[in-house]
């Protein structure tokens, strides 16, 4: 068996615990606030880059984690995150947003760096998540 999960049961189990914690702490639309421990106010920034990374990870983890219920919940959140990221709120119009795909990412708010901006890695993980999702449908 050359499966990536061979001998990694404990690793995937721990990753499942982390994923479950994230599911409990995400807002209804799946786009996290810039910090899970930040006070939530109307002006609290959302982080599209974190959502894109999570969506990609939820899809990948769903391929290896045992249990149908966990797989379904990870995929459901990934789908929700991808749909929200593809909405007008987060998806930039072509030729805008410095030609980046996603809007509203946060790099380092405490340093006042990369706040509510497009980020290269947000686009990368968004595209990776879309590709992983497409490949699941095959």
Please give the residue ranges for each predicted region.
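Single conserved hydrophobic/aromatic residue that forms the stacking wall/gate
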Residues: 1-12
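Flexible, active-site-adjacent loop/turn segments at secondary-structure boundaries
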Residues: 12, 30-34, 99-100, 117-119
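Non-catalytic alpha-helical scaffold/packing segments enriched in small hydrophobic residues
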Residues: 14-21, 53-57
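CBM-like carbohydrate-recognition segments
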Residues: 43-56, 61-62, 67-138
